[in-house]
């Protein structure tokens, strides 16, 4: 397992290269702008790679009614274009949603 910590706003080409040319990737978006992180890097995922983002709920109303997690910073409406354009499907969300994470896998 290789772990890389990068400033995502200064290293897009370097991070893209790690995703494209590396093995299976689990990309965790948990910085100050999760929407930008998700939308920037999801396009580089390979088949069966996984992307997750924290402080997530499918919608504001879902979050208000369930409050599994105290903070909401990213919801489906923020990433729907990336989900559709990059062929992402939900993956193990029954588990991850409880902890405020979305989880998508590239088909």
Regions found by a protein language model. Give the residues of each.
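S-adenosylmethionine/decaboxylated-SAM
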Residues: 1-107
